Curated annotation (Swiss-Prot):
Pfam family, one: ASC
Reactions that this protein is recorded to catalyse: Na(+)(in) = Na(+)(out)
Family membership: Belongs to the amiloride-sensitive sodium channel (TC 1.A.6) family. SCNN1A subfamily.
GO cellular component: a single term: sodium channel complex
Coiled coil location: none
Biological classification of the source: Eukaryota, Metazoa, Chordata, Craniata, Vertebrata
Topology Extracellular: residue spans: 103-553
Entry protein name: Epithelial sodium channel subunit alpha
Gene: SCNN1A
GO molecular function terms listed in the Swiss-Prot or TrEMBL record: ligand-gated sodium channel activity; WW domain binding
Quaternary context: Heterotrimer; disulfide-linked and containing an alpha/SCNN1A, a beta/SCNN1B and a gamma/SCNN1G subunit.
Record keywords: Cell membrane, Cell projection, Cilium, Cytoplasm, Cytoplasmic vesicle, Disulfide bond, Flagellum, Ion channel, Ion transport, Membrane, Sodium, Sodium channel, Sodium transport, Transmembrane, Transmembrane helix, Transport
TM stretches of this protein: 82-102, 554-574
Ranges annotated as biased composition (Basic residues): 178-197
Control of this protein's activity: Originally identified and characterized by its inhibition by the diuretic drug amiloride.
Amino acid sequence: MHQVVTVKAEKVPMGKRLRRCKQEAENQQKVEEVAEKLEKEHEGLIEFHKSYHELFQFFCNNTTIHGAIRLVCSKRNKMKTAFWSVLFFLTFGLMYWQFGILYREYFSFPVNLNLNLNSDKLTFPAVTLCTLNPYRYSAVRKELDELDRITHQTLMDLYNYSMSQVQSNGAAQSSQKRSQRSLSHHVQRHPLRRRKRNEPVSLKGNSPPVDKSDWKIGFILCNETNEDCFHQTYSSGVDAVREWYSFHYINILARMPDTKALDESNFESFIYACRFNEVTCDKANYTHFHHPLYGNCYTFNDRNNSLWTSSLPGINNGLSLLVRTEQNDYIPLLSTVTGARVMVHEQNEPAFMDDGGFNVRPGIETSISMRKETTMLLGGSYSDCTEDGSDVPVQNLYSSRYTEQVCIRSCFQIHMVKRCGCAYYFYPLPPGAEYCDYTKHIAWGYCYYKLQVEFKSNILGCFSKCRKPCEVTKYQLSAGYSHWPSAVSENWVFHILSQQNKYNITSKRNGVAKVNIFFEEWKYKTNGESPAFTVVTLLSQLGNQWSLWFGSSVLSVVELAELILDFIAITIILSFKRFRSRQVPAPSVPPPGAHDNTAFQSEPADPSAPHRFTVEAVVTTLPSYNSLEPCRRDGEAVIGLE
């Protein structure tokens, strides 16, 4: 059955068509505005690219790094793309190799050495002069009597030498008996013995090869249980006797309640004359201290409130001293050197006479010229120096400013107290400690000499812990010698000195010595350090390398950093999306037998049932062909089909 539908075309008027076009344009504009508004509403604070390809495509199209744009522009030519890719990454690697060299140089903290010559008034250094005799022998003879007898007997046994050439047999026998009693109590643990060994010995360090036949004398040191002993040996018998005598002399001093009363601190009895810059010195210009071996010591120009200054060089513009060097009352077995000992050092620094001093000969005028030299080091990462010693893990036992020697000696004394239970007499006493005395500390000598071996080989770590100061001032000394006074003038010179000091100089030339200390020149040298590779230099070198290889700026570095951050962010986002997709459950599927239920079976078709269907036709009016004509836009009209 067919039904024919007749459609009647109706022509749309022109005005209606224009209105319709205008309405469609307005609707299109509204749709675009709504879409733009929705896009702005959905725009976030931080937007990332959707893929790696999009990220690198955007970077290569917009970066200011030279060569990166070629990776995109040459993508249709695979050979060029490969060439520029290899060249780009090779250049990148070379640039960062240069960066590594620059960073390594920067973190090595190199320095430049600066040498300056300064011309100014020079502050005169402190000068310490010692008598080389710790005590007057007449004042300590009673305390040293037992030690002297033991030493005399030892010299007789070893070298057949008697200190007293005229001695009765009874006195000798009595002395020998007393010595034997003393040896059994004190010295038998540390006896002097002659030893001769023919086998060679190898010494550690830089010591020259020594045959053991040269090691002739020494003394034994044992621990408290006498289970461990060793020989403290010397190649010279004089050195061995003096060291052994000094060891027991220290024990005697430690037992004495007060040794200050024995000090001969009379300035005039040692210093006959003192002048600085042609002006006489007075008591306000020196300080006094006592050394157990070097005796009474006088330090000139150590008062910080009134320091001497020198404007001109020369012998007449320095310090001139006339000192007494007679040995009428010296300890014979301890004071083996005649003269005086002098040392030049900075103010507020202890005078370590055995390290930096030298001896002045009697009957000689010693002229010492000085040249000042200051070294200033950079601290922090540039060198292992310290400003004031506050960052050094060693307690300063001296009442002075920090020096390397102060730290080293304090370190040894602290280890001495910890290891041996007592302090060494030559160094300051730590709080709560007492000086070593073998009546209380039987094996302190064994402990001390064992500790000395560890100290010198840096097993204690004192040389590693004690760092050098960042500013050090040293004086380069040059000495000249001449006989004083001359043979034709010595009579009247010594006569005047005897009348002036009320002391009869009997030995004349061997009784006095003259010392002149002055600046050789009024210029002094300063050695300084400055950083050779600063942060500014590093940034400049990095910029030069970046410009050389890529011709870019700091903003290009920011672009590269942005690329790295975007790459990391995209990696995290994609990984998170992949993880979420694995967590979403799959859609449910009906069971395989769901349609087996008889209730869901379709009805069988009845062949006798008639076929019925309904056809609905929707008849609309066909548009006019004039409606296909485009609307006017921008003042133009396009004519369509009629």
